Each structure stands twice: as C-alpha cells, then as structure tokens.
Amino acid sequence: MQSDMTSRSEKLHVGIIMDGNGRWATRRGLSRLRGHEAGVETIRRIVEAAPKQGIGTLTLYAFSTDNWRRPKAEVAALMTLLRFYLANEVQSLVKNGVRLTVIGRRDRLPDGIANAIARAEAATAHGSTLHLRIAVDYSARDAILNAAAKAAALTSLTREAFSQLVTGEAGLRDVDLIIRTSGEKRLSDFLLWEGAYAELHFTERMWPEFDAGDLAEALAAFHGRERRFGGLQAIMPEEVPSLSRV
C-alpha cells in the first residue's frame, strides 16, 4: 500500500538504467551499434510517455564513467549517437515542454558533444512538463566524492545543501523509483545519494524492447508498495491489541 509520503498526485522522479542494447542486437544477428540506435528510439517513446504517467523528472543512465573501457569504436559510435540525439531532438523537446539537463563530467567529452549539450540545455531551459536528465560520463561515487571535497571548505552544512553539491541542482526531488532493464540486478554506480530510499524494479526486457506499457507496469508495482523511509510498517486498526484483551 502506497505511503502518504508519496501520493499518486505527486510528480515522481524515476531513474532508468538503460541496459541490454548490445545483447538485444546480438540475439538478432545485428551489430551492437544497431542495438544502441534502437535504444535511442526507446528513449523517444519513454520521454513521451513519462509525463502522462505521473513522472516529473526522468534520469536516464546513458554512459557511465566505466564505459570508457569499452572498445574505442563502440565509444565513438555512442558519442556520435549522443550528438545526433541532441541535434535532432531539441525541437521536439522544446515543443513538448521538456527541460534537458546532462549530468556527469564534461571535460573528457569531445568538444562537439560538450557544445551540443550546452546548446540543448539552453534551448530547453524553460520546459516545465518534464525534466529529462541524461547521465553521461557519470559516476555516483565520483559525484559524492566531488561534493565532499567542496563541502570541506564550508563551516556548516545541511543535508539539503550537500544534496545540491552532489546533484548540481537546488530542490531536486529524491529518486522515487529506479528501473533496470535486461534482467541485471545491480545499481552500477547510479544515483547512489539521491536514490537512497528509491524503490527498485528489475525487468527482463531489453532496453530496445521497453515501452510505455512496461513503464506503466513498473509504476503500478511502485504504487503498490509501502514506502517506510526507515520507519515501521503501518499497523491496521484490527492489528492493534485491545486493552480489554491484555
């Protein structure tokens, strides 16, 4: 049963680990690049569906810091796809009221990618229907470590202030639900601070297969859970012992 602390009327923050592009392609005798291209199509579908399903913030794990270890050709292809997405989706994002933010390091990205990110963020800055956050060259542990280094120079610190140092944004809602596709069951260094009390949903579906129905299924499971945030399970009236029976 859903806790009052997260009602259905609230706009949720959902994070998705988009996993399984390569395996989806390999099983079909296709190149891994074709799998990543299909994954971009899924991003379009989910970005469109998210606001209709009560999501206000959507964080997508696109490229981790550890992904630099992949073959250079695959990394180059992923960067090309990212540049293509940024260049071709901005107009649609603006039209649909989507604000885009890219989180993670930018100093190691090709100049063309970094510039495309800046242009896309500026163009979509006033979107209010959905906040789309794409994690590129991202590591949650690095984000926490960098925040701690900045916090060391402060004389006082609140949890809210530290959260802003970690996320780079004031007032960002903590993550309510993290979804991972492909059947893997781990967080892979994703949203470790802001997802401290996130519910987890793992699906066998590969990312290119994931659709609005799968998203709705994950959200239905989420709304069926009781979020305790460290507290105790709610006790139903019939479970409370009567003094007359004590």
Curated annotation (Swiss-Prot):
GO terms for biological process: polyprenol biosynthetic process. Its cofactor is Mg(2+). The active site is at D19, N67 (proton acceptor). Its EC number is 2.5.1.-. InterPro entries: UPP_synth-like, UPP_synth-like_CS, UPP_synth-like_sf. It comes from the Bacteria. GO terms for molecular function: ditrans,polycis-undecaprenyl-diphosphate synthase [(2E,6E)-farnesyl-diphosphate specific] activity; magnesium ion binding. Coiled coil: none annotated. This is Isoprenyl transferase 1. The gene is uppS1.
